[in-house]
């Protein structure tokens, strides 16, 4: 399973376009890949560009915080079968990965509309 998150320079999970890096943790290989966030500097279509990137990287799960996705990017992610680990707030990425089994218990294929960016 490949689990992705957008992270800040300080290592906190953030909304898709709001962190300069994307980290993908591969549970089978037990390794982490770090990429520059392709939507970080865009003016438009930021979230959709990131979803396209995540799909190109064969991501299975996205760790998300409220307003990580907009309705368009969420629709694309859902249609392509991405699953979500929903956090109530930004947390350190390492903390989530260290407790991954706990977070995977709440793995979902949907995000409530009130958590999408307007």
Q: Positions of the model-derived regions?
A:
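Non-catalytic interface/targeting segments
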Residues: 1-45, 56, 82-118
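Well-ordered alpha-helical segments embedded in enzymatic catalytic cores
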Residues: 46-50
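Mid-chain, well-packed structural core segment of small domains
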Residues: 53-90
